[in-house]
């Protein structure tokens, strides 16, 4: 999982390699007005709700 703060907007971009039913891809989400901790938790919750597995590595 990669977490970046965008300088000009203050947004937080969370990206991770995810897997669903044998297919893997890079999933990214942009969070405005979130703390890094809250953005990371929201990303994890979204992946869990969609039954995506976040790949470790």
Give the positions of each predicted feature.
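Short, mixed-charge low-complexity intrinsically disordered segments
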Residues: 1-2, 44, 48-57
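Short N-terminal "domain-start" leader segments
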Residues: 1-19
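Intrinsically disordered, low-complexity serine/threonine-rich segments
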Residues: 12, 18, 31, 45-49
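Stable alpha-helical structural segments in soluble proteins, enriched in small hydrophobic residues
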Residues: 39-43
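A short, exposed loop/beta-hairpin motif centered on an aromatic-Gly-Thr core
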Residues: 23-38
């Amino acid at each position: 999982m990669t977490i970046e703060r965008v300088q000009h907007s203050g947004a937080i971009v969370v990206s991770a390699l995810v897997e669903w039913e044998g297919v893997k891809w890079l999933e990214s989400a942009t969070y405005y007005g979130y703390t890094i901790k809250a953005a990371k938790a929201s990303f994890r919750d979204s992946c869990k709700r969609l039954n995506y597995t976040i790949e470790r590595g």
